[in-house]
């Protein structure tokens, strides 16, 4: 947490992404990614492959009804290896978590969970009025002790203008390069979307994992189809895949088999 806050006075940028499983986490570690956000996942498998990485964990918005349940969940995740707790709940809940000594991350700008009554999935802060609302929100979070925010799809001029006016660490997701940490999703970075999908504006594919996954799937279907076909034609198992008795043992076995009688009648 101390190192994150020190980014405000440094030109250094850190990277953050959201591995979905231990395999993706291992790839992130090997690639040098600095920070993980795990969401509402089990933490232990990620800690096995990334024991020293900074990891944020979360509860989904409607997972718990009461403040006490949220606090209990936050403590549980911290015990299991989380370094910070993400929540979209009220300022009161955030402040209560802070008062318990839990580093809190929240969210400003586009919040997909609430997009259905905020004009859909769109850019935020494109008007001066909305930009001021974003600034006032992050300052309110600062006042209650929030450590960090995900700044999603905010006009780059806005984050550039407010980032040094707050002590809250900013994780920029589609909000320009002024964030203290630059975040993107593993699926977007690796190009896991299919050609038919329309990725969000802020997404940039640095790889072609989606095409490779499709190729692997096609190859898997081809192999399974060939197996199914060969069995149905009575061609498989092939002679070279079978096990044979030692020379002369079949004759002995057949002789014993012919002479066999039940022990119990």
Question: What role is predicted for each listed range?
Answer:
Residues 1-265:
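Alpha/beta enzyme core
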């Amino acid at each position: 947490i101390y190192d994150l806050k020190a980014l405000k006075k440094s030109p250094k940028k850190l990277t953050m992404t959201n591995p979905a499983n231990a395999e993706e986490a291992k790839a992130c570690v090997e690639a040098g990614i600095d920070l993980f956000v795990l969401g509402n996942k089990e933490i232990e498998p990620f800690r096995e492959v990334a024991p020293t990485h900074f990891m944020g964990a979360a509860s989904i918005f409607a997972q718990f009804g009461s403040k006490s349940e949220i606090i209990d969940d936050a403590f549980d995740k911290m015990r299991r290896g989380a370094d910070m707790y993400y929540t979209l709940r009220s300022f009161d809940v955030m402040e209560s978590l802070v008062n318990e000594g839990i580093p809190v991350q929240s969210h400003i700008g586009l919040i997909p969970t609430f997009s259905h009554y905020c004009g859909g999935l769109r850019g935020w802060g494109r008007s001066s009025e909305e930009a001021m609302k974003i600034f006032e929100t992050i300052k309110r979070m600062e006042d209650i002790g929030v450590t960090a925010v995900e700044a999603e799809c905010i006009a780059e001029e806005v984050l550039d203008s407010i980032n040094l006016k707050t002590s809250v660490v900013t994780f920029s997701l589609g909000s320009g390069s002024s964030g203290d940490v630059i975040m993107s999703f593993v699926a977007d970075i690796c190009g896991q979307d299919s050609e038919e999908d329309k990725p969000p504006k802020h997404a940039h594919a640095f790889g072609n994992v989606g095409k490779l996954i499709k190729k692997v799937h096609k190859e898997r279907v081809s192999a399974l189809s060939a197996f199914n076909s060969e069995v149905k034609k009575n061609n498989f198992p092939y002679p070279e895949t079978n096990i044979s008795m030692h020379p002369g043992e079949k004759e002995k076995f057949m002789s014993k088999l012919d002479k066999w009688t039940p022990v119990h009648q």
